[in-house]
Amino acid sequence: MVSLLCCGPKLAACGIVISVWGVIMLILLGVFFNVHSAVLIEDVPFTEEDIFEDPNPPAKMYRLYEQVSYNCFIAAAIYIVLGGFSFCQVRLNKRKEYMVR
């Protein structure tokens, strides 16, 4: 039978901790980008054409903020999947401890 166990107990626990931290951080960043926080303007990928040549510059900037917000939420979802994988590895390691060799 093929074993799905590919991580040790310490690596799996570390993966859970990093995933929880990543999900919390990315959800907060996504919320802050969604409310168009002025502090995060440096992280919005805009060019001078977006500001000076656009007849309605705030609308373009708001779309860019929302795009970065969606990217943060997608990355948080990926971290949730990786956290679930790490949790499964922890469970498999626990089950391996109880098996008789």
Curated annotation (Swiss-Prot):
The entry's keywords: Endonuclease, Hydrolase, Membrane, Nuclease, Transmembrane, Transmembrane helix
Predominant place of localization: membrane
Its membrane topology: Multi-pass membrane protein
Keyword Nuclease belongs to the record: yes
Pfam families: V-ATPase_su_f
Protein name (record): Ribonuclease kappa-A
Family: Belongs to the RNase K family.
Transmembrane segments: 13-33, 68-88
Biological function: Endoribonuclease which preferentially cleaves ApU and ApG phosphodiester bonds.
GO annotations of cellular component type: membrane
Originating species: Xenopus laevis (African clawed frog)
GO molecular function terms attached to this record: RNA endonuclease activity
EC number(s) stated in the UniProt entry for this protein: 3.1.-.-
Subcellular location: Membrane
Xref: InterPro entries: Ribonucl_Kappa, RNase_K
Enzyme class: hydrolase
Superkingdom of origin organism: Eukaryota
